[in-house]
């Protein structure tokens, strides 16, 4: 009286790979290019020479550049801005934060770890060093300086 309808769905994109070499050959061919992302649709934010010099000053770098180096920096910065604009245009409604696999570090864990450290002669850690042993004149655990500090 009741009939159960079962239908198997299948689809094909291409032929099945016959060997590992075919798979490797397929994976060698790029399917997309990052240069397509760098083609700017927006030119509203563009780095010009005064902005470049200001960025160099803020970074503590020299602003004395030859024309070729300056042009290269401008092209690189504009490409980065274009890429950032493209990334910001992507709408991301859902995202999941990746859970961390570790527990938070506690002060007691740090104390325990430092308590287990041993000195290594390979690193030049040879034991206790008392700088007062090197002083020719000392008094009550302090260096004694016999020079005048001011100019005469």
UniProtKB/Swiss-Prot annotation:
GO terms for molecular function: ATP binding; glutaminyl-tRNA synthase (glutamine-hydrolyzing) activity. Keywords: ATP-binding, Ligase, Membrane, Mitochondrion, Mitochondrion inner membrane, Nucleotide-binding, Protein biosynthesis. It is an enzyme of class 6 (ligase). It is a peripheral membrane protein. InterPro entries: GatF (IPR027499). It is found in: Mitochondrion inner membrane. GO terms for biological process: glutaminyl-tRNAGln biosynthesis via transamidation; mitochondrial translation. It holds the Pfam family GatF. The keyword Nucleotide-binding applies. Its EC number is 6.3.5.-. One of its GO terms (cellular component) is mitochondrial inner membrane. It catalyses: L-glutamyl-tRNA(Gln) + L-glutamine + ATP + H2O = L-glutaminyl-tRNA(Gln) + L-glutamate + ADP + phosphate + H(+). Belongs to the GatF family. Allows the formation of correctly charged Gln-tRNA(Gln) through the transamidation of misacylated Glu-tRNA(Gln) in the mitochondria. The reaction takes place in the presence of glutamine and ATP through an activated gamma-phospho-Glu-tRNA(Gln). Required for proper protein synthesis within the mitochondrion. HAMAP family: GatF. This protein may be expected to contain an N-terminal transit peptide but none has been predicted. This is Glutamyl-tRNA(Gln) amidotransferase subunit F, mitochondrial.
């Amino acid at each position: 009286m009741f009939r159960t309808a079962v239908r198997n769905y299948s689809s094909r994109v291409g032929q099945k790979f016959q060997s590992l070499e075919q798979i490797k050959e397929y994976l060698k061919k790029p399917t997309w290019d990052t240069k397509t992302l760098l083609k700017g649709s927006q030119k509203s934010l563009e780095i010009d020479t005064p902005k470049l010099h200001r960025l160099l000053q803020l970074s503590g770098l020299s602003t004395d550049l030859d024309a070729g180096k300056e042009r290269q920096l401008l092209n690189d910065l504009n490409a980065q801005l274009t890429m950032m604009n493209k990334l910001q245009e992507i709408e991301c409604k859902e995202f999941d934060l990746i859970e961390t696999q570790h527990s938070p570090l506690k002060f007691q864990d740090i104390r325990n770890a430092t308590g287990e450290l041993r000195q290594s002669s390979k690193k030049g850690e040879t034991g206790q060093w008392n700088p007062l042993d090197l002083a020719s004149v000392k008094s009550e655990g302090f260096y004694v300086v016999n020079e005048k500090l001011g100019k005469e």
